[in-house]
Amino acid sequence: METGSPGKRPVLPKRARLLVTAGMGMLALLLFGPRLVDIYVDWLWFGEVGFRSVWITVLLTRLAIVAAVALVVAGIVLAALLLAYRSRPFFVPDEPQRDPVAPLRSAVMRRPRLFGWGIAVTLGVVCGLIASFDWVKVQLFVHGGTFGIVDPEFGYDIGFFVFDLPFYRSVLNWLFVAVVLAFLASLLTHYLFGGLRLTTGRGMLTQAARVQLAVFAGAVVLLKAVAYWLDRYELLSSGRKEPTFTGAGYTDIHAELPAKLVLVAIAVLCAVSFFTAIFLRDLRIPAMAAALLVLSAILVGGLWPLLMEQFSVRPNAADVERPYIQRNIEATREAYRIGGDWVQYRSYPGIGTKQPRDVPVDVTTIAKVRLLDPHILSRTFTQQQQLKNFFSFAEILDIDRYRIDGELQDYIVGVRELSPKSLTGNQTDWINKHTVYTHGNGFVAAPANRVNAAARDAENISDSNSGYPIYAVSDIASLGSGRQVIPVEQPRVYYGEVIAQADPDYAIVGGAPGSAPREYDTDTSKYTYTGAGGVSIGNWFNRTVFATKFAQHKFLFSREIGSESKVLIHRDPKERVQRVAPWLTTDDNPYPVVVNGRIVWIVDAYTTLDTYPYAQRSSLEGPVTSPTGIVRQGKQVSYVRNSVKATVDAYDGTVTLFQFDRDDPVLRTWMRAFPGTVKSEDQIPDELRAHFRYPEDLFEVQRSLLAKYHVDEPREFFTTNAFWSVPSDPTNDANATQPPFYVLVGDQQSAQPSFRLASAMVGYNREFLSAYISAHSDPANYGKLTVLELPTDTLTQGPQQIQNSMISDTRVASERTLLERSNRIHYGNLLSLPIADGGVLYVEPLYTERISTSPSSSTFPQLSRVLVSVREPRTEGGVRVGYAPTLAESLDQVFGPGTGRVATAPGGDAASAPPPGAGGPAPPQAVPPPRTTQPPAAPPRGPDVPPATVAELRETLADLRAVLDRLEKAIDAAETPGG
């Protein structure tokens, strides 16, 4: 190897330079190539869905943050390096044996600019990239407005705390990072060039090093003073008193807040003492100031509040925390919209006073009682409506309502989607998987309040064709025949929850002009996609990009891809909304509806904040389990609004965002940040609005908060005596809370069907029923919450107690033993329904599923029995239990003959139910069990009792029940004042 003359750097041969250059290029391509591909694909996709302005705004915001933070950090660090380098000692002994940094110093001296600029720029870019994730804070600060509500402590508008304060904190944090990095860079540079020597016995520091380090240390302390000042405002979101309440308490206001001001003053004095090192050589002054700051932070900022909390607040907490609990109550009600303007409270006895058949509201409620459980029937839908092995329904079906022939009816609904996971054999070939099996077929609904027929023979239930949904199918076949209960003009489904489970998730549609259709449509027809959705891959550049993205060379060589081909990506409705509106939080349960003849997914979207002063924290997301098994709570928020309703067209993927809360200042802020992306509420079609449901995620948050925040008096709030709890799910062994349920019930004023989301509530650490919460979904009253409050000493049983009472009933227990010989038992949703002018009716469907004896055989649930229960009048918590193949028979068992006539009978078609009493032969009406707190015994029966005698006894008992009813009414009249 040739070497140059002394003093010249060695030169690499030309071939070596080419290899190094090629290697660096390959490394850069590997590092940045996939990211550049993703950026270009996003550019194409956002343009296809019409939201490219969102992508550009977010990108420019993040680039601006990167540039600003990188410039500040790199500038400060570079200035520190430059000052330290220029003020280095003129002579530093270059003796490696005595100076361990001498080789490094020599290397730096050969290329000082490269090292200086390289370190500064690298640190700046890294900090800028990390800071770019704060783009949401920047946009909220730039476009934020006011709430029109001021905080109770400082008198500032809430907008300051949620829009401005997070931005100020972020700016302060990055300034702090920049100054600390500059201090460290100065320290290392002075050490490298001899301004700081540690090799001598006591060390040495040059004047230039002392001044520079002191200035940067003073800047750090000065920034800490600003941090103490901002800490004062963040006390209003303090978690010191959690779980009792959120926000500043007595200790925060009377100890922490003054302590922050004291620490601000001390930090400023400490910073000034560091700056005096510019003129004074004695470093003991800043050292003592720093010690004073640390000691003050411990004593004033830590020990003083701790002592006040321990010896002054806790012994008198109920009194001293009272005004701060009141602040928390008011803020939480406002932040979650659970205040008096949105929640109506009504006293409710919990014991029925009338026969349901005599109450118009109850007649409607009973006729609409939902017997089909969307959590159980997905496999039934799949087995009976699948058509092909590659079609499937969502694991949990949905509930919605439709007006058919003028009658409002709730339906269990699902979309027959393509299931990529169900493809087998040659169906999984790349061509078939991505170009042939591309879409689902149809919308399937079933009336939620009835089945095709009652299943009566317990021993042969699994062999009967009873207890199954009555389907209304809107697909390609029914479109051709013209027989559709719910008219759908375009039943093909290219976007959905199930179809998006493909890995990777994409379909290739279209082809060369004039080419034959290849997408599977039916057994006798194929189809070519004509929708607007999809990114064009008709040119070779885009094909190459997608071949790179999906690591699939067949994009380049397949003859199935032509000039008109497009690729459909991001097919999950929820994901599409999240991508076009990254500032929204989406509900976990999109649901399909039919609007104007098209299948559309509705996605509820929320605006959220996490710094609303004094508001209780909660989470819209359930616990998340990491791959390592660690369970983490979802994102904590302190403000939620269901401000946007989003729709995704199931055929072409069109995403539309509709404003749904004109009063939400957070949504108004985002609409200013992304103009034109959210349509005004006036543009919501009436047919679409009729299908809006109150979202489950929001309701679950609100009911958990109402369990505490229905209490008005702070002292009572502190004692927790009046709190409620969300009941555990009696049908689930995993200790989960009972999910809310959608029901169609009679409206209290008009007795017309009203679609609501409801939940029972039990007492705090008790199982007795305490309240019943329902949220209206009808357009006229959407969002209104109704709370029925039971007396605090109520003995009305809650869901878990009722479940125990029902399954321990001797009739249920004995037949369950018979059923379990060849079936698995599934208990459906336990519905709680206000009824009988003060009472609560519990209804629970019981499903059976035949135990499979062959791996190839398929089994699925069917409705076999209906359990009902009500509280016995005039007893200490006794209940009546009804158990029969139909709801009508079960109701007659608990209310007496006649009530069951208003229930919807099995049979009919999906559009209309059979007339009352047309549900087939039913056994004679049973008499309510005796009034007792114990489960009723099964009626005696045996082969030695003649049938005529049985009929005579039943008739006599029915007459006796009528006499008892008249006697109860007479007693009520006698006890009524003035009666």
From Swiss-Prot:
Query: Which parts of this chain are annotated as the region Disordered?
Result: 898-948
Query: Subcellular location, in the record's words?
Result: Cell membrane
Q: Which keywords appear in this protein's UniProt record, sorted alphabetically?
A: Cell membrane, Membrane, Transmembrane, Transmembrane helix
The topology of this chain with respect to the membrane is: Multi-pass membrane protein
Extract the coiled-coil ranges from the record.
Answer: none
Which coarse location class applies to the principal site listed for this UniProt protein? membrane
Where is the sequence biased in composition, kind Low complexity?
Answer: 902-912
Membrane-crossing ranges are: 19-39, 63-83, 114-134, 174-194, 211-231, 260-280, 288-308
Q: Which Pfam families match?
A: UPF0182
- One cellular-component annotation, GO: extracellular region
Q: Where is the composition biased (Pro residues)?
A: 913-946
Q: Determine if RNA-binding is one of this entry's keywords.
A: no
HAMAP family, A to Z: UPF0182 (MF_01600)
Q: Which family does it belong to?
A: Belongs to the UPF0182 family.
Protein name as it appears in the record = UPF0182 protein BCG_0095
Q: Which organism is it from?
A: Mycobacterium bovis (strain BCG / Pasteur 1173P2)
What does the organism's lineage look like at the top?
Bacteria, Bacillati, Actinomycetota, Actinomycetes, Mycobacteriales
